[in-house]
């Protein structure tokens, strides 16, 4: 269903029954639950007859299966026309199943079938969209840089048949929406997983442009000369140390219906600004990082990746709001031309900043982008970045921190939890602004304290948000990149977080304002 120039999702179809022909090489994924300390088939009717259910449950009993969440068993079932059945445990039986539980176990199932080309599933009877999303996200692979020696010989999951009793029109729309969302997440993952040798500011900008134009977006790119001329001191300053100059990319989805009078938006239409940090590699600059795990800094453009994927998704889903993404891109390198600790730069808009630590570079490029984004007079501003290591210390590897205007911050965090990305609202105490005082400039880019690092960074960014704009920043320093083992629908490497959160916010704004 994807027409993107990048990631191609499996083909998804929805059926009201198991086809009797053409599925001889397919695997049927069947959810089971824990019932009376044994595994019992769930969501069988009307897709599985009693003989098939009895055969599956008898086989599971002989294996001692309990139906615990994530527990899988591969079975050959003579009563069904498929090659085999994969049972996937949901855990203790309940009346309703949260969407992310369905999404997560679908991801587990897909990962356990990594050499299977075609699957069918009755998980979709529990939640059609969540099952499709989970299967696509769980089957994600990044193999672009594998040679013939190590590349997978199979093509991975290419076809999904979701079994559902939904009406044809509802099923078609749900399948397309789920495919589009999962494709957006996979696109963000691809960006994050692409090494900095191949994804530097100019190349990143070109790929963003290709995606944007394919989705019908308006695209603008400012090169290094244009950035200097326009006064983007933060982006220029961070990029000074690299031989690969910085860029600023603007992607615009004009979904709000215009009136005839001067192109004004009607009262019910909203404009949302998105800003994402695009540091294609971060050494820390002159304030250089430790060598251990520096290779993970290929993910320091995770915020930009998610923002680009989200605005493309908004266009594909034809959201009736304006969404304008402003994406600064730079490489933070040490060299004879790099900015130094103690330098003073002028952010776009005129604020002067004493750079006490060149490894606090993300906030410098974001501040420029925030000011530019606010010139579009948005109703809402959502930023995201791999902002601070302090996010990881405070919230761990899977929980983004959300800072911003109190009501909008809470709205973003709530929606993030609903879609399974599980962000947590964080405060911005007013007294932290005193920690950013400078004796030579308007602001310092870091405080002199090692405490509250995430909140101090958020306080810095707040200084650049225009009055009256509802604002939220999502810090995904650890959640954007999974350095551990895969789990659920989340692979090792780029995760695509917080693409689904931002899209959920955009959808709610489109519905409710």
Swiss-Prot record:
It is an enzyme of class 3 (hydrolase). GO terms for biological process: proteolysis. GO terms for molecular function: manganese ion binding; metalloaminopeptidase activity. Presumably involved in the processing and regular turnover of intracellular proteins. Catalyzes the removal of unsubstituted N-terminal amino acids from various peptides. Keywords: Aminopeptidase, Cytoplasm, Hydrolase, Manganese, Metal-binding, Protease. This is Probable cytosol aminopeptidase. The active site is at 289, 363. The keyword Cell inner membrane does not apply. InterPro entries: Leucine_aapep/pepB, Macro_dom-like, Peptidase_M17_C, Peptidase_M17_leu_NH2_pept, Peptidase_M17_N. Mn(2+) 2 binds at residues 277, 282, 300, 361. Its EC number is 3.4.11.1, 3.4.11.10. Binds 2 manganese ions per subunit. One of its GO terms (cellular component) is cytoplasm. It comes from the Bacteria. It catalyses: Release of an N-terminal amino acid, Xaa-|-Yaa-, in which Xaa is preferably Leu, but may be other amino acids including Pro although not Arg or Lys, and Yaa may be Pro. Amino acid amides and methyl esters are also readily hydrolyzed, but rates on arylamides are exceedingly low; Release of an N-terminal amino acid, preferentially leucine, but not glutamic or aspartic acids. Belongs to the peptidase M17 family.
